[in-house]
């Protein structure tokens, strides 16, 4: 070869060596070009690398590529296609799943991307035998034009037209070509390069595409622009041969234009070396894999959501297998990661001219502009081999023969820590089914799709996995998993409990506080053992089930007492009323804790006194000088009223002011501030701080109570312990109404009063909590509560025995004046027999939250209320400590009062927790709530604070309207909302035994509503609350206070209906266009992640029925009418016809409304399920497929073998006559096994026609032969059908029509009946109609 030829060969494609990868040349041209290059060098080093260059030149356009290799690489053939070839082209996707290997065939290329960044991003080639598909189609008939096809075709045309003689020369020819021809070829190649750059600019604007076999979503990376035309003619610096040998494939730092090709069969000249050719392709392809994947990772957009797929078994890769043809090659072009395939058809002697290219581009643009967008496709409409559909892909992007790919928009980034996994199914919708949107999609089996994700039964991940099976779907799917919804909440404050036992200890504060412990102690002293047994019995029947119901609601709904009514917004007023009532309880009960701190302060001895302060005289001038110590009967009562309550006006003290609403001593205000500061420190970090301190504020008081009780038992004379229950008269167990009233009220105040806090506490759990955690908490809470109350009852009985030993007796007093607030009397000094001998068990009693009311003198109820707060701490316990000071030191007294203060602080924290959470989940909201609570509790620390305390406690503390609110909650949850929050479902969360679960369900549904209403009546009578509503008679309260009290009690109850009215206005004024949808959102909104019913489904079904009626009328004109004409019937009058029609419309409207409101699942249409490709799809409605003809014989339409083999035919099997899915009340269903329905496809419109036609009336033919006709609408059932079959038939027909897929969405159903030969064509023509 001359030097000029060598220079021309060196200039060929040298400037584009970094922008092109090559096509494999066939024949000897490639080898000769390499030999010529090797001979031109003349050095031994080039001779050693000669063979290495030959191997690489088989795969790439090297710097020294000869004209013959270009000719062989760009060769194309145009064979005329036969009819068989065209059929095979259409059936090419059916061969995607075949995987038989051909030994001498190179492998088509597919991609599989790794999940992790650290994994090797590999692309592999697989060879699989498939059906024969022609490699080319005529240009004007091609559906789409590939980018790589256009590039190679233009290159081929330019080379053939302008330098045919030069390209046809071999490497051994010694002819000398002119320099002008070489320059001309180079100029055309540079023009082609500019054309490719313009194509790159257009392709860069395309959206990112997802490869079907890939695991990640990669955006299209732009190519690096080549040099300008002025600089392209400058020759680049020549690299050394060592660098060419080491870097003969690709350079890593450049954006490459990759054009890769593999030959299915080598030409005859190199057929003997096919084995070595296969071997030589592997290293080059391996390097190409690494570089392309690295380049894709570098250009990946960080804002794009990385789609992660669940771990699946080996899914067959979709590969296109092309048959081997002699002297034919297949070009596979990969443009920046997109899988595209294309071939260019020509005849062997015909050249591709510029006119052909221009015409082809015009046709492509016309097709792209005329292509209409297609809406989203729900579900799958075609079983069998996947059919490629490209509604959103450009016309030039890929050929028909390439594997199907899916184009989708980038999903928006979620705010949650985890993202839903988008799994793209390989089974796509057909072109016919993508035209119209479908509001209803029936679940279908995925047994025919080997790559469907429904074939893999896997446990659900914490991150929601959604399956997307539509090629044109661009709507992001919503995650459904409950754990992902929980992760959206603010973490670190009220998200979860820090320890496993924190929730259990916090729940103890709801049932075990200083107030109910003091009440329980005093009631045990007054009523004895009868009260204990009655309380235990009522707790088992009513109290404990009520507590467990609140725990189950909190754990099930996972929301607070107000936000829990997202399940039924119309009942939100119930939660607001409960929180309001509990807020008032927390405000006025705080001052009682300040009283305990005053007692704790005065326990410690000082230098001025050696004993307790309540042993000294409060006012020495009131007593004789001889009585220095004073009477214990007076000192204990005066200490509480004067020193603790600061009621200085009672003793005419000089420091007393004329204004009773005055803070005489600021000690109570200081203790109130100290208490609220402690509450803030405990709740400042939400559940995190409360859970950590729960082990201190709940455990230590309980342990200290046990220690103090043991000490008092030790002090009591052992011989008198056996007489503790001797005073109890068990004969009055059933007849003493006062005892039963006290036990009933105490049961509710202990187990149900603070239910709002129970719901708020149980709505959160520990991170590692299992399903049995709720049962553990429920059982431990009951045990700890009963133990605490039992210890307190034992302590109270010991104190009563100590008083009896020292000659004192306890008689409940009243707080009003010194004459009545004394409660400890000495048997020696007091001689009033009426006061000492009156049995305490017969005194009328009423319990409120912080105190009790005993009406000793019924004639003076308008003067003495009989109320006293914390009777055990303010009346009994200080007197016992004074009498037993020799055996019980002040240390034990300090421990006892500290224990009571700890119980009170713990209960105040759990009461204030839902109130502070209502303002917000932050430290500032807790601080704001605590400061507000401090300011609102200051009035109770004034001189008249005890009077205000009694008034508020009488109105709100355990009043008659509180049980009514809890009754409304039970009705709202069980009746208005219903499933899945009824008793049968909630009781399963406790995981108790069968008998206990049945009893709880019975108690929640029947016993609790009855018991709460009865308790409301009992409270109303026992508390004398009628004085608030009868303003004429005498009363303890003033006229204005009675009006205010009635307004407060009724106002709390009116919160429920007022909130319901507001919610009705909000939901009916705004929302979905369908009024029934709005009503459903108001009463029974769908759960989070559950799609509401679609009103468009009913409209579509109605439209389908109207279409069916119209088509039936047209088709009925051709049917033979053999029946005799009916007898004459006079037409109805206008009034009768109009009234009947209106009555029918009204009846149908009421039925639809009731079904929508009650959620009757027997009439519910199946809606689109986001997990339609899940492993266990829901079974379609049970349709009746056995229909009977007038003769009474069973008619079964079995497809013929020809139709059954077609993928567009179905098989209608015979089912049992019994209707196995009959609806029950309140939406319940008899569950049936779906084994017979899970293996069949959903019914389409054509299926419905076929099934309904199987119930036709067989009419006799006219004029020879029997004519069997089919009617679209079924006739009413005859008398021969049974009643059961008659009822099931109409229900099945209605379900068939309502649940059928819309027409024109799936291929028609071909059902060939067993007809006579003369009527086969007519039957087939009738079966093509749609409803």
From Swiss-Prot:
According to the UniProt entry, which residue ranges have a biased composition of type Gly residues?
Answer: 28-43
User: What are the glycosylated positions?
Assistant: 168, 627, 631, 857, 921
**Per the UniProt entry, what are the Gene Ontology biological process annotations, in alphabetical order?**
glycine import across plasma membrane; neurotransmitter transport; R3/R4 cell fate commitment; sodium ion transmembrane transport
Alphabetic keyword roster = Coiled coil, Glycoprotein, Membrane, Symport, Transmembrane, Transmembrane helix, Transport
The residue ranges flagged as biased composition, category Low complexity, are 437-453, 1197-1209
- GO molecular-function term, one example from the UniProt record: neurotransmitter transmembrane transporter activity
Bias class Polar residues marks the residues at 16-25, 258-282, 413-436, 463-473, 1097-1115, 1186-1196
**Deletion phenotype:** The imaginal disks of third instar larvae are dramatically decreased in size. Overall larval size is unaffected.
Transmembrane stretches, start-end? 505-525, 531-551, 567-587, 667-687, 696-716, 741-761, 778-798, 890-910, 926-946, 956-976, 998-1018, 1044-1064
Q: Which GO terms describe its cellular component?
A: membrane; plasma membrane
Superkingdom to which the source organism belongs: Eukaryota
Residue stretches of biased makeup (Basic and acidic residues): 369-383
What is the membrane topology listed in the Swiss-Prot or TrEMBL record? Multi-pass membrane protein
Region: Disordered; residue ranges are: 1-62, 221-284, 363-473, 1086-1136, 1169-1238, 1256-1275
* Family classification: Belongs to the sodium:neurotransmitter symporter (SNF) (TC 2.A.22) family.
Function, as annotated, reads: Putative sodium-dependent transporter which is required for viability, early imaginal disk development and adult motor coordination. Also has a role in the fate commitment of the R3/R4 photoreceptor cells. May function in ommatidial polarity by regulating the activity of the core polarity genes, acting upstream of (or in parallel to) Vang, dsh, pk, stan, and dgo, but downstream or independently of fz.
Q: Beyond the main fields, what else does the record say?
A: The name 'bedraggled' derives from escaper mutant adults which upon eclosion, immediately fall into their food and die due to severe defects in motor coordination.
Please state what the protein is called.
Sodium-dependent transporter bedraggled
Species source reads: Drosophila melanogaster
- Recall the taxonomic lineage recorded for the source organism: Eukaryota, Metazoa, Ecdysozoa, Arthropoda, Hexapoda
């Amino acid at each position: 070869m001359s030097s000029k030829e060598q220079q021309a060969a060196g200039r060929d494609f040298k400037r584009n060596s970094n922008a092109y990868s090559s096509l494999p040349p066939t024949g000897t041209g490639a080898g000769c070009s390499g030999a010529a290059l090797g001979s031109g060098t003349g050095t031994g080093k080039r001779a050693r690398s000669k063979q290495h260059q030959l191997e690489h030149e088989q795969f790439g356009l090297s710097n020294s590529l000869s004209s013959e290799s270009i000719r062989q690489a760009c060769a194309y053939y145009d064979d005329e296609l036969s009819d068989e070839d065209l059929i095979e082209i259409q059936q090419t996707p059916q061969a995607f799943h075949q995987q038989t290997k051909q030994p001498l065939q190179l492998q088509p290329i597919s991609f599989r991307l790794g999940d992790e960044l650290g994994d090797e991003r590999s692309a592999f080639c697989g060879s699989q035998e498939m059906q024969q598909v022609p490699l080319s189609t005529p240009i004007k008939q091609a559906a789409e034009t590939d980018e790589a096809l256009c590039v190679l075709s233009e290159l081929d045309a330019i080379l053939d037209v302008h330098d045919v003689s030069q390209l046809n020369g071999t490497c051994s020819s010694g002819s000398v070509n002119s320099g002008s021809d070489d320059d001309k070829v180079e100029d055309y190649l540079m023009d082609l390069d500019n054309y490719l750059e313009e194509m790159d600019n257009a392709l860069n604007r395309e959206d990112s595409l997802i490869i079907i076999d890939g695991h990640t979503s990669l955006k299209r990376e732009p190519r690096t622009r080549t040099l300008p035309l002025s600089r392209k003619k400058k020759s680049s610096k020549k690299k050394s041969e060592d660098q060419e040998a080491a870097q003969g494939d690709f350079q890593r730092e450049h954006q490459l234009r990759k054009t890769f090709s593999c030959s299915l069969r080598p030409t005859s000249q190199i057929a003997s070396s096919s084995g070595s050719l296969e071997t030589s392709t592997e290293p080059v392809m391996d390097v190409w894999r690494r570089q392309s994947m690295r380049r894709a990772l570098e250009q990946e957009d960080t804002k794009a959501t990385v789609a992660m797929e669940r771990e699946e078994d080996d899914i067959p890769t979709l590969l296109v297998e092309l048959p081997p043809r002699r002297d034919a090659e297949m070009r596979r072009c990969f443009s920046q990661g997109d899988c595209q395939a294309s071939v260019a058809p020509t005849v062997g002697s015909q050249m591709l001219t510029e006119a052909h290219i221009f015409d082809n581009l015009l046709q492509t643009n016309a097709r792209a502009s005329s292509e209409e967008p297609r809406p989203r496709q729900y579900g799958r409409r075609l079983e069998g081999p996947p059919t490629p559909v490209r509604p959103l892909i450009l016309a030039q992007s890929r050929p028909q023969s390439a594997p199907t790919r899916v184009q989708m928009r980038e999903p928006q980034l979620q705010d949650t820590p985890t993202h839903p996994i988008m799994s793209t199914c390989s089974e796509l919708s057909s072109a016919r089914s993508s035209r119209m949107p479908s509001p209803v999609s029936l679940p279908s089996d995925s047994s025919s799709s080997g790559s469907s994700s429904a074939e893999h039964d896997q446990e659900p991940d914490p991150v929601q996995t959604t399956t997307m099976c539509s090629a044109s779907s661009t709507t992001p799917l919503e995650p459904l998993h409950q754990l992902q919804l929980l992760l959206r909440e603010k973490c670190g404050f009220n998200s979860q409990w820090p320890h496993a036992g924190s929730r259990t200890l916090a729940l103890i504060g709801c049932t075990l506080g200083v107030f109910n412990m003091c009440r329980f102690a005093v009631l045990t002293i007054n009523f004895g053992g009868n009260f204990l047994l009655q309380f235990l019995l009522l707790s088992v029947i009513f109290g404990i089930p009520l507590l467990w119901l609140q725990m189950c609601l909190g754990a099930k709904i996972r929301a607070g007492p107000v936000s829990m009514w997202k399940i039924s917004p119309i009942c939100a007023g119930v939660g607001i009323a409960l929180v309001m009532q509990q807020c008032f309880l927390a405000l006025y009960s705080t001052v009682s804790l300040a009283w305990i701190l005053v007692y704790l302060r005065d326990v410690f001895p000082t230098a001025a006194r050696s004993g307790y302060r309540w042993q000294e005289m409060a006012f020495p001038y009131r007593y004789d000088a001889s009585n220095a110590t004073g009477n214990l009967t007076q000192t204990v009562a005066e200490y509480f009223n004067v020193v603790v309550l600061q009621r200085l006006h009672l003793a005419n003290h000089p420091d007393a002011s004329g204004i009773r609403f005055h803070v005489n001593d600021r000690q109570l205000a200081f203790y109130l501030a100290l208490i609220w500061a402690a509450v803030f420190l405990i709740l400042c970090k939400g559940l995190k701080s409360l859970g950590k301190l729960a082990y201190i504020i709940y455990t230590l008081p309980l342990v200290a109570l046990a220690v103090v009780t043991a000490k008092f038992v030790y002090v009591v004379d052992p011989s008198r312990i056996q007489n503790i229950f001797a005073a109890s008269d068990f004969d009055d167990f059933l007849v003493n109404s006062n005892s039963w009233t006290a036990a009933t009220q105490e049961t509710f105040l202990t187990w149900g009063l603070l239910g709002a806090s129970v719901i708020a506490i149980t709505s959160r759990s520990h991170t590692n909590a299992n399903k049995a955690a709720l049962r553990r908490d429920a059982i431990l809470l009951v045990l700890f509560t009963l133990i605490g109350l039992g210890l307190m009852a034992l302590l109270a009985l010991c104190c009563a025995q100590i008083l009896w030993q020292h000659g004192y007796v306890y008689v409940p007093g009243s707080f009003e004046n010194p004459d009545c607030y004394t409660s400890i009397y000495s048997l020696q000094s007091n001689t009033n027999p009426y006061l000492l001998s009156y049995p305490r068990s017969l005194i009328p009693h009423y319990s409120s939250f912080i105190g009790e009311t005993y009406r000793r003198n019924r004639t003076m109820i308008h003067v003495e209320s009989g109320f006293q707060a914390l009777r055990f701490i303010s009346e009994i316990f200080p007197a016992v400590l004074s009498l037993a000071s020799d055996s019980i030191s002040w240390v034990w007294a300090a421990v006892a009062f500290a224990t009571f203060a700890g119980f009170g602080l713990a209960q105040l924290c759990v009461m204030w927790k839902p109130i502070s959470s209502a303002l917000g989940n932050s430290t500032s909201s807790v601080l704001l709530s605590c400061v507000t609570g401090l300011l609102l509790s200051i009035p109770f620390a004034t001189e008249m604070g005890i009077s205000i305390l009694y008034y508020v406690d009488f109105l709100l503390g355990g009043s008659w309207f509180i049980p009514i609110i809890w009754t409304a909650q039970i009705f709202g949850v069980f009746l208005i909302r219903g499933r899945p929050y009824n008793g049968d479902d909630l009781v399963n969360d406790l995981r108790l035994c069968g008998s206990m679960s049945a009893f709880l369900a019975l108690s929640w549904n029947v016993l609790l509503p009855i018991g709460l209403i009865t308790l409301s009546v009992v409270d109303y009578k026992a508390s004398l609350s009628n004085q608030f509503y009868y303003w004429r008679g005498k009363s303890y309260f003033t006229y204005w206070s009675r009006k205010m009290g009635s307004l407060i009690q009724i106002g709390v109850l009116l919160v429920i209906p007022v909130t319901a009215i507001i919610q009705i206005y909000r939901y009916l004024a705004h929302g979905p266009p369908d009024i029934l949808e709005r009503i459903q959102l108001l009463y029974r909104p769908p759960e989070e992640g559950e799609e509401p019913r679609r009103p468009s489904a009913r409209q579509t079904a109605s439209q389908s029925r109207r279409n069916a009626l119209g088509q039936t009328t047209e088709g009925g004109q051709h049917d033979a009418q053999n029946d005799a004409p009916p007898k004459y019937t006079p037409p109805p009058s206008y009034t009768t016809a109009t009234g009947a029609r209106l009555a029918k419309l009204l009846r149908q409207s009421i039925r639809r409304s009731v079904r929508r409101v009650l959620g009757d699942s027997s009439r519910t249409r199946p809606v689109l399920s986001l997990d339609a490709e899940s492993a266990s799809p829901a079974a379609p409605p049970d349709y009746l497929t056995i229909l009977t003809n007038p003769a009474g014989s069973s008619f079964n339409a079995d497809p013929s073998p020809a139709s059954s083999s077609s993928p567009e035919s179905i098989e209608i099997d015979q089912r049992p006559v019994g209707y196995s899915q009959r609806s029950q009340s309140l939406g319940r269903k008899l569950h049936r096994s779906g084994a017979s329905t899970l293996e069949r496809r959903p019914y389409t419109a054509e299926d419905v026609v076929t099934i309904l036609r199987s119930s036709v009336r067989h009419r006799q033919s006219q004029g020879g032969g029997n004519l069997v006709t089919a009617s679209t609408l079924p006739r009413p059932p005859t008398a021969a059908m049974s009643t059961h079959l008659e009822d099931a038939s109409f229900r099945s027909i209605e379900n068939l029509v309502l649940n059928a897929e819309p027409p024109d969405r799936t291929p028609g159903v071909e059902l060939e009946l067993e007809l006579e030969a003369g009527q086969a064509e007519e039957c087939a023509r009738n079966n093509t109609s749609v409803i």
